[in-house]
Regions:
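Conserved SAM/AdoMet-binding glycine-rich loop
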Residues: 76-79, 86, 91, 189-314
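Terminal RNA-binding accessory module
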Residues: 346-448
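Conserved, mostly hydrophobic/aromatic
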Residues: 160, 180, 197, 234, ...
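Contiguous mid-protein beta-loop-alpha structural module that forms a pocket-lining wall or clamp
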Residues: 311-318, 325-328
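Proteins enriched for Cys/Gly/acidic motifs involved in redox and nucleic-acid/cofactor modification
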Residues: 1-205, 245, 256, 260, ...
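Radical SAM enzyme [4Fe-4S]-AdoMet core and its adjacent flexible, acidic
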Residues: 12, 206-224, 228, 274-275, ...
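Generic beta-strand/beta-sheet core signal
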Residues: 8, 80, 198-200, 235-237, ...
Length: 448
């Protein structure tokens, strides 16, 4: 009898890669993947615990999935990921429907958990937080067939005071260049055209392999040699190790997207110090000036935290003025989340939730206006775009949805082509001219 598997992957793209590896292991064991949880014999929930809202979403998703033990075919519920790693005792005690917990380094033990379920036992597998997958692992790609995430490192050594990730993901550890290149070659052979390189701290790639010196530029040089890969994008570029050599290869290598995602979190020096960030405002400004002065335009994305403990109105205003001055192309804003087990979470000068929300909306409003201005400046320009899906438009027309080369999957806006007929299909990369720019999206036409 065929065994069916349902899954939900929450949180970041790094978590999604872990999910895809677990799916690959289970498929090799004879499971078929279904989108209908009601029909699934086994359900896996890969959880996130980065902020409070992510915890709430994870708990609610687990409880919803548990209902399929009564209303569906589910015989086993496996909970994996960061929430499992951090709250294993509480989850096992308070949600008895959970059959197995798998920690962040134990994804390769998913079959051990399944075997325990088949024998009527509950299991909690948390060892090996030093683990990291490699090219030999089976993996079921859940993203569109032409774009895939590649995790080049795991864990983090930065110790930001607001973040629990080092405790639940372990110390920073890199895959070898050979392993990553082999995986990218395999993805290319399956039809992938865009790879998105990810890690907790992508610019630190290789420091554990090369006596404290990053190897990211060396990795990029090897990946650009892989035939079939047309776009290489990087996310989570921590500013400390962002070198001139890295900027140079981004600017000059055609396959590399002219796109830089630098999570700055704040710019006030006192706040940065309290966050245990290594870079000062002056360091940040020097780096951004280099990027802005590059001979080729490089899209700038960042992420910011508002409402960090003790953040004053003046410090928040400094942040707002900085954002207005730099004019990031894209920005993600998060309200500070008080996390158990973190230094910042133990502070007594927490900012009231209503103040954090007000600051969030203020900064998002500022950025929306900047993004709209930036996108309007694109009107009349020509860029490459990747088609992601076709939708039915008005009056029986076909609407193509996709991304410019300057837009990352999942986190940025979209590009739309109206009335494209049968000229394009998902996965196509083609030249387009931007006709209209809005706060997050653009409308374009095909360059014939």
């Amino acid at each position: 009898m065929t065994k069916s598997l349902g899954y939900i992957s929450l949180g970041c793209a790094k978590n999604l890669v872990d999910t895809e590896v677990m799916l690959g292991l289970l498929k090799d064991d004879g499971y078929t993947i279904t989108d209908n949880l009601h029909e699934a014999d086994l359900i896996i929930i890969n959880t996130c615990t980065f902020i409070e809202k992510a915890k709430e979403e994870s708990i609610n998703t687990i409880l919803e999935a548990a209902q399929y033990k009564e209303t569906g075919r589910c015989k086993g519920l496996i909970v994996a990921g960061c929430l499992s790693q951090q709250y294993q005792d509480e989850l096992f005690t308070e949600i008895p429907e959970i059959d197995a917990l798998i920690g962040t380094g134990a994804w390769d033990q998913v079959m051990v958990a399944v075997d325990a379920i088949e024998h009527g036992n509950r299991s909690c597998i948390m060892e090996n937080i030093t683990n990291i997958y490699d090219e030999r692992m089976p993996r079921i790609q859940t993203t569109p067939r032409y774009s895939a995430y590649v995790k080049i490192a795991e864990g983090c050594n930065n110790g930001c005071t607001f973040c629990i990730i080092p405790k639940v993901r372990g110390a920073f550890r890199s895959r070898s260049i050979e392993s990553i290149k082999a995986e990218v070659e395999r993805l290319s052979a399956s039809g992938v055209k865009e790879i998105v390189l990810i890690a907790q701290d992508t610019t630190s790639y290789g420091i554990d392999l090369n006596n404290g010196k990053p190897l990211l530029t060396e990795l990029l040089k090897e990946l650009t040699k892989v035939e079939g890969i047309e776009w290489i994008r990087m996310l989570y570029l921590y500013p400390t190790f962002f070198s001139d050599e890295l900027l140079d290869i981004i600017v000059n290598e055609p396959k590399l997207c002219k796109y830089v995602d630098i999570p700055l979190q704040h710019v006030n020096n006192d706040i940065l110090k309290q966050m245990n960030r290594r870079d000062s405002r002056e360091d940040i400004e020097r780096l951004l000036k280099k990027i802005r002065n590059a001979p080729t335009h490089v899209t700038l994305r960042t992420s910011i935290i508002v409402g960090f403990p003790g953040e004053t109105d003046e410090q928040f205003q400094e942040l707002c003025e900085f954002v207005k001055d730099i004019k990031f192309d894209n920005m993600g804003v998060f309200t500070y989340s008080q996390e158990e087990g973190t230094i910042a979470g133990a502070r007594e000068d927490q900012i009231p939730e209503e103040v954090k929300e007000e600051r969030y909306h203020t900064l998002m409003s500022i950025q929306a206006a900047i993004s709209e201005e930036n996108n309007r400046d694109l009107e009349g320009t020509i860029d490459y775009a990747m088609i992601e899906e076709l939708e039915e438009g008005d009056n029986n027309t076909v609407l193509a949805k996709g991304r410019l080369k300057s837009q990352a999957p999942d986190v940025d806006g979209n590009m739309y082509i109206e009335d494209c007929g049968d000229k394009v299909k998902p996965g196509d990369i083609l030249q387009v001219q931007v006709e209209q720019g809005f706060a997050y999206d653009v409308v374009a036409t095909i360059v014939e």
